[in-house]
């Protein structure tokens, strides 16, 4: 169904799960959470496990979305959390926490400026939430890779330029060559 689901068979769980868990457990569980590109619902499951009450997780792939929906219903008996929906769309969301991790839509852009504008659009369509958890392909990853072209590889300066006047924290979640690519997780907080 999804090649990344093999991570359940590895000896160690992905580092981003641990970091996302530790960050999210500090937030108010009544926060409105919008997750973009939830895949099979790994982060959605963390949110539900931690007791968040207002979670909307979007997945554009219908088959993967259905699998994530079943998973959340089976694990937490929660319906309506995962939706098969493209984002951004003509639907406006209001979120306190926006989550975009382990999800890259490189095909929608051709330049770094277009990619940064797309990320900004995600943020605006979520009504400029106070907290934005975003994992990106790090610019330190320099290998040729058509799935992760150079224009979507970001560094801290790119993120700071996009979110001026915000507090920005970051964690390396994957590092090439130990992993297949380098990724950094950012927590962007409005001040």
Description of each model-found segment:
Residues 96:
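Conserved acidic residues
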Residues 107-121:
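A short, conserved alpha-helix within the catalytic core of class I
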Residues 1-28, 36, 40-52, 58-77, ...:
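Class I (Rossmann-like) S-adenosyl-L-methionine-dependent methyltransferase catalytic domain
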Residues 99:
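A conserved beta-strand element that flanks and buttresses the S-adenosyl-L-methionine
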Residues 27, 123-127:
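A generic alpha-to-beta junction signature in SAM-dependent methyltransferases
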Residues 45-48, 119-123:
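A structural alpha-helix within SAM-dependent methyltransferase catalytic domains
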Residues 102-103:
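Short catalytic micro-motifs in class I SAM-dependent methyltransferases
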């Amino acid at each position: 169904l999804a090649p990344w689901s093999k991570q359940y068979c590895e000896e160690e769980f992905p580092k981003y799960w641990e970091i996302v868990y530790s960050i999210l457990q500090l937030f108010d569980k009544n926060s409105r959470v919008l997750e973009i590109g939830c895949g099979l619902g790994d982060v959605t499951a963390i949110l539900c496990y931690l007791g968040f009450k207002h979670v909307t997780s979007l997945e554009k792939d219908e088959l993967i979305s259905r699998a994530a929906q079943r998973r959340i219903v089976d694990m937490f008996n929660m319906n309506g959390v995962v939706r098969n929906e493209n984002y951004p769309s003509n639907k406006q969301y209001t979120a306190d926490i926006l989550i975009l991790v382990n999800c890259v839509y490189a095909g929608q852009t051709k330049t770094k400026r277009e990619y940064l504008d797309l990320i900004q659009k995600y943020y605006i369509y979520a009504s400029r939430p106070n907290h934005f958890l975003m994992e990106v392909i790090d610019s330190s990853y320099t290998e040729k890779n058509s799935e992760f072209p150079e224009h979507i590889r970001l560094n801290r300066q790119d993120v700071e330029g996009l979110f001026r006047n915000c507090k920005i924290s970051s964690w390396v979640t994957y590092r090439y060559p130990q992993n297949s690519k380098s990724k950094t997780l950012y927590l962007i907080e409005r001040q």
